[in-house]
């Protein structure tokens, strides 16, 4: 009550922000007559003038009124479009490191030209980020004439472009591209073998379109670049045969319920758990198939990979459905994006899940992958000096934007008042009743000439509605992942009188639905249209436009509530753009996923008590409220998941930053000999310490062991025992110095053979390659640690703290291994002539290129089988107590990690 009263007196934070910005809008409007008087050349010359002023120390903020006035005037001359006052407000919000919530049809693309131009003046580059390649290309081509008129260069960054073209795109003042491609380029730059291979500049200003989709919907899944691991396709096939023998249990086991099934499914967490009975049965079946030895347990350390295969197969059968989560096309399993309904060609699930789905569908199983580099969108976008975004729906997620990205959300008012009618939800008992009611509604509306857009949450649901419409003889277009190519054309004509369009989720987002259809699309179909033809098409369109407005505008039907209120609002937002008429309604049933999982039995109980007959719907504020509460629950759960992912990824992020900084410094220098000399001293000290403990008696020295180690790991033949026999006065310190001096001498002889320049080149190559190889293994080990760390909670320990502690010690061990491997490799390499080093370099380059071609880019669930694979590889061979410890510390196993066991 008090807060409401204070808001009434002082206005909300949003009102105060807009009030402050409206003063600047007044100044920009006052400059308009002055700008109109300028010739084209004088207007273009403003860009150079602004750049000089910035160099002299003026701030970007001080240029806002003039720069915005220049862009508005240029837009009038190039496009014949004048920025509305609300678009100027939006531009200021975006420059202010905030998120601008602007309704659909309010011209976000044109608004973005203002802050993009302003921030490109510094010459550091602006990245405009869109959700797909089509929008990136469309927006770049649409805005190119405006920016080029003002003397700015425009680049497009698309997947599959060669490195020189990418470098050129990034060197432009303003670059358009997709979120995935920017992230992958960052990872690839940090895997480059020479400074020339890098494509990105320093990350300066990112302007994210559909910011909610990119920074929230896709934030749970990291970007991963992976390379091939070993082939285990046969195992997937064998395990896949076993799964159909298992029976699903309806509910999870608890104190009150002990089921009879073999596995239970937790739909909320998207996890599958074996029951006691299931474990016994699966172990029997594995023994019968000859996959596991009799008397062994699935949970024994030696069967860790087998457990991984069983879990992946169970998840593939119980949680992933064809035509909902993926489609099978040309013998390939293609993932369907749950947020947009689009297919994600070339993307693969990790953790062996994709292989398990391939086995289930009987298509060819492709090799598993090992993570080479990964980053989450949260951490990638936080690398930019300045970040801003725009969307039609951000207010429901304002808290998350603020707490994770430090971005405030500002709701920008619409240019014209919104008059769309949002009707209450109708809830039916069964799916069939709901579909029937939707068909009746469509019939009624199209009879009046009103266009209808039906939003579904999966391909499967869109095909169910499509089949029913076909039976009813209603002509319609289907827009889902299977018909990706016609997307923009179908969306553009969805406003045609009596048109019926079915769209999965938010497919076609970013394309306006114009009431009466798009006359531009009709003109584009004619080869050489005459002015008369164009005038006729426009006149016909005007008639259709008026007819659609009279029938009530575009009607939106939602066939199911989405987990997030925001995505429901996006669907509604396709109608009622720029003050047009429109309406919307959601049809639900008690069989919908959201209702089944979250709206509990209470609502269905209430519906039964009301004595509902088949085909009847309930329409009540209580029900709508119960659904909104269910959605809030899901939203807060998803927020917690993303927050937790971020907290864990922050640990990896600190390490990633340290490694990438080190790697870039290494790339930029040509001589690393000083570093090599310094780490050689460290490595030899640690190695000698393992056999000659500091300040110890001679009886405690293990000289034969040391000689053998130096020979095996560093290819050094040193008669240490002979030295000690001949020189009794040779004490520990002098001996250490002599061993190091001898190793340096041998190395220098190698250098004399090949020449200093060639050796420096070779040292740098070895260092980069070793760093990449160990970092890859470290990522796998971190994934593996992450998967099991939650179990520490049972020991009353905080899993996050444990993860931080252990990952830090793993990182320290990796750095020690790096030193050891580099010195060992450089010591062991045999060179007799310069050509041999050149041949090795060539071989290394070819191997790097081969791996680059085999790399796979994925944006998927945050877990990796690579880790488990690595653990299994190292778990096969038992380490002897006197062997060097595998951690690379240089100590014996019994004096290092062997002590723990």
Curated annotation (Swiss-Prot):
The keyword Protein transport applies. May bind 1 zinc ion per subunit. It catalyses: ATP + H2O + cellular proteinSide 1 = ADP + phosphate + cellular proteinSide 2. InterPro entries: Helicase_ATP-bd, P-loop_NTPase, SEC_C_motif, SecA, SecA_CS, SecA_DEAD, SecA_motor_DEAD, SecA_preprotein_X-link_dom. ATP binds at residues 87, 105-109, 512. It is a peripheral membrane protein. Zn(2+) binds at residues 885, 887, 896-897. SUPFAM superfamilies: Helical scaffold and wing domains of SecA, P-loop containing nucleoside triphosphate hydrolases, Pre-protein crosslinking domain of SecA. Its EC number is 7.4.2.8. Signal peptide: none annotated. Its cofactor is Zn(2+). One of its GO terms (cellular component) is cell envelope Sec protein transport complex. GO terms for biological process: intracellular protein transmembrane transport; protein import; protein targeting; protein transport by the Sec complex. Coiled coil: none annotated. Its main location: membrane. Keywords: ATP-binding, Cell inner membrane, Cell membrane, Cytoplasm, Membrane, Metal-binding, Nucleotide-binding, Protein transport, Translocase, Translocation, Transport, Zinc. Residues 891-901 have a biased composition (Basic residues). It is found in: Cell inner membrane; Cytoplasm. Induction: Repressed under conditions of excess protein secretion capacity and derepressed when protein secretion becomes limiting. This is regulated by SecM. GO terms for molecular function: ATP binding; metal ion binding; protein-exporting ATPase activity. Belongs to the SecA family. Monomer and homodimer. Part of the essential Sec protein translocation apparatus which comprises SecA, SecYEG and auxiliary proteins SecDF-YajC and YidC. HAMAP family: SecA. This is Protein translocase subunit SecA. The gene is secA.
């Amino acid at each position: 009550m008090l807060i409401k009263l204070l808001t009434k007196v002082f206005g909300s934070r949003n009102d105060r922000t807009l009030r402050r910005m409206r003063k600047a809008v007044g100044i920009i409007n006052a400059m308009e007559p002055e700008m109109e008087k300028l010739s084209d050349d004088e207007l273009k010359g403003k860009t150079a003038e602004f750049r000089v002023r910035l160099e002299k120390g003026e701030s970007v903020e001080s240029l806002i009124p003039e720069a915005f006035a220049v862009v508005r005037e240029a837009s009038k001359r190039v496009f014949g479009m004048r920025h509305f006052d609300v678009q100027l407000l939006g531009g200021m919000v975006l420059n202010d490191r905030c998120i601008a919530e602007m309704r659909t049809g309010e011209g976000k693309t044109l608004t973005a030209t203002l802050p993009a131009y302003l921030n490109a003046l510094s010459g550091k580059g602006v990245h405009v980020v869109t959700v797909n390649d089509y929008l990136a290309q469309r927006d770049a081509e649409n805005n190119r004439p405006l920016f080029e008129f003002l003397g700015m260069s425009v680049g497009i960054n698309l997947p599959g472009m060669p490195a020189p073209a990418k470098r050129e795109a990034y060197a432009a003042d303003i670059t358009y591209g997709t979120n995935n491609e920017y992230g992958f380029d960052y990872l690839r730059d940090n895997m480059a073998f020479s400074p020339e291979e890098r494509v990105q500049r320093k990350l300066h200003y990112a302007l994210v379109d559909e910011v909610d989709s990119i920074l929230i919907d896709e934030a749970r899944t990291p970007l991963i670049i992976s390379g091939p691991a070993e082939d285990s396709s046969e195992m997937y096939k064998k395990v896949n045969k076993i799964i159909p023998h298992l029976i699903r249990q309806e509910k999870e086991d608890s104190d009150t319920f002990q089921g009879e099934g073999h596995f239970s499914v937790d739909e909320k967490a998207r996890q599958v758990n074996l029951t006691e009975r299931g474990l016994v049965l699966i172990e029997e079946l594995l023994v019968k198939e000859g996959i596991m030895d009799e008397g062994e347990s699935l949970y024994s350390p030696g069967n860790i990979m087998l457990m991984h295969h069983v879990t992946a197969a169970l998840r593939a059968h119980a949680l992933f459905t064809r035509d909902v989560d993926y489609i099978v096309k040309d013998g390939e399993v293609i993932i369907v994006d749950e947020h947009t309904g689009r297919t994600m060609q070339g993307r693969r699930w990790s953790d062996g899940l994709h292989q398990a789905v391939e086995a289930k569908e009987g298509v060819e199983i492709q090799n598993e992958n090992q993570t080479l580099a990964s980053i989450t969108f949260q951490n990638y976008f936080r690398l930019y000096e300045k970040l801003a975004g725009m969307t039609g729906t951000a207010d429901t997620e304002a808290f998350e934007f603020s707490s994770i990205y430090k971005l405030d959300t500002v709701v920008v008012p619409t240019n014209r008042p919104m008059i769309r009618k949002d009707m209450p939800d109708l809830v039916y008992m069964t799916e069939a009743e709901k579909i029937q009611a939707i068909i009746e509604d469509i019939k009624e509306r199209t009879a009046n000439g009103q266009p209808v857009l039906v939003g579904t949450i999966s391909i499967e649901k869109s095909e169910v509605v499509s089949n029913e419409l076909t039976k009813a003889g209603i002509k319609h277009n289907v827009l889902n992942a299977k018909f990706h190519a016609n997307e923009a054309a179908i969306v553009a004509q969805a406003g045609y009188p009596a048109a019926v369009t079915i769209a999965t989720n938010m497919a076609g987002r970013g394309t306006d639905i114009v009431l009466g259809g798009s006359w531009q699309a009709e003109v584009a179909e004619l080869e050489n249209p005459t002015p008369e033809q164009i005038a006729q098409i426009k006149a016909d369109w005007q008639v259709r436009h008026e007819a659609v407005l009279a029938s009530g505008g575009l009607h939106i039907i939602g066939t199911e509530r989405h987990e997030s209120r925001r995505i429901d609002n996006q669907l509604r937002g396709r109608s009622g753009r720029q003050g047009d008429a429109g309406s919307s309604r959601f049809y639900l049933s008690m069989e919908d996923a959201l209702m089944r999982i979250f709206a509990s039995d209470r609502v269905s109980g209430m519906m039964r008590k009301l004595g509902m007959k088949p085909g009847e719907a309930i329409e009540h504020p209580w029900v709508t409220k119960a659904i909104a509460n269910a959605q809030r629950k899901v939203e807060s759960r998803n927020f917690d998941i993303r927050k937790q992912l971020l907290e864990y990824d922050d640990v990896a992020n600190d390490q990633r930053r340290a490694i990438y900084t080190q790697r870039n410094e290494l790339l930029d220098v040509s001589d690393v000999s000083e570093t090599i000399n310094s780490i050689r001293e460290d490595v030899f000290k640690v190695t000698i310490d393992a056999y000659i403990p500091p300040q110890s008696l001679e009886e405690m020295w293990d000289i034969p062991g040391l000689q053998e180690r130096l020979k095996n790991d560093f290819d050094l033949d040193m008669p240490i025992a002979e030295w000690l026999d001949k020189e009794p006065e040779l004490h520990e310190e002098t001996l250490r110095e002599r061993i190091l001096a001898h190793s340096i001498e041998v190395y220098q002889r190698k250098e004399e053979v090949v020449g200093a320049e060639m050796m420096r080149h070779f040292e740098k190559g070895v260092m980069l390659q070793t760093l990449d190889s160990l970092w890859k293994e470290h990522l796998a080990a971190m994934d593996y640690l992450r998967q099991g760390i939650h179990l520490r909670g049972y020991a009353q320990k905080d899993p996050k703290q444990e993860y931080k502690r252990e990952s830090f010690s793993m990182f320290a061990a990796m750095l020690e291994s790096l030193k050891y491997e580099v010195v060992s490799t450089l010591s062991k390499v045999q060179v007799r002539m310069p050509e041999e080093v050149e041949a090795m370099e060539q071989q290394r380059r070819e191997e790097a290129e081969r791996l680059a071609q085999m790399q796979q880019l994925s944006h998927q669930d945050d877990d990796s089988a690579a880790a488990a694979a690595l653990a299994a590889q190292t778990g096969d061979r038992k380490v002897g107590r006197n062997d060097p410890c595998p951690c690379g510390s240089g100590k014996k196993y019994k004096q290092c990690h062997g002590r723990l066991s």
